[in-house]
């Protein structure tokens, strides 16, 4: 009876390890497929999404607003 319980516990532990490693490998596989695929390569350009939101030049209205804000 003790042997059967030990075998059951060991089997459950190995099943959990396999299930977790399967999820890990499937996540890595899906990430690799998305990077290699045409859509994945096209989406790499979207990483620069914040480039348009930063304007290095300040207009006169911006300077006036900053002066009023800092008074």
From Swiss-Prot:
One of its GO terms (cellular component) is other organism cell membrane. Keywords: Amidation, Antibiotic, Antimicrobial, Cleavage on pair of basic residues, Cytolysis, Fungicide, Membrane, Secreted, Signal, Target cell membrane, Target membrane. The keyword Secreted applies. It is found in: Secreted; Target cell membrane. Expressed by the venom gland. The modification Isoleucine amide is found at residue 36. Coiled coil: none annotated. It comes from the Eukaryota. The keyword Iron-sulfur does not apply. One of its GO terms (biological process) is defense response to fungus. Its main location: secreted. Residues 1-23 form the signal peptide. Residues 37-71 form a propeptide. Belongs to the non-disulfide-bridged peptide (NDBP) superfamily. Short antimicrobial peptide (group 4) family. Antimicrobial peptide with potent activity against bacteria S.aureus (MIC=6.25-12.5 uM), E.coli (MIC=50 uM) and yeast Candida albicans (MIC=25 uM) and Candida glabrata (MIC=25 uM). Is not very effective against P.aeruginosa (MIC=300 uM). Also provokes moderate hemolysis on human erythrocytes (HC(50)=10.8 uM). This is Antimicrobial peptide VpCT2. It comes from Mesomexovis punctatus (Scorpion). The lineage of its organism: Eukaryota, Metazoa, Ecdysozoa, Arthropoda, Chelicerata.
């Amino acid at each position: 009876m003790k042997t059967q319980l030990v075998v059951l516990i060991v089997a459950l532990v190995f099943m959990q390890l396999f299930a977790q490693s399967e999820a890990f490998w499937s996540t890595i596989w899906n990430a690799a497929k998305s990077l290699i695929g045409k859509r994945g390569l096209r989406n790499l350009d979207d990483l620069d999404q914040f480039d348009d939101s930063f304007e290095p030049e300040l207009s006169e209205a911006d300077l006036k607003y900053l002066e009023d804000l800092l008074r």
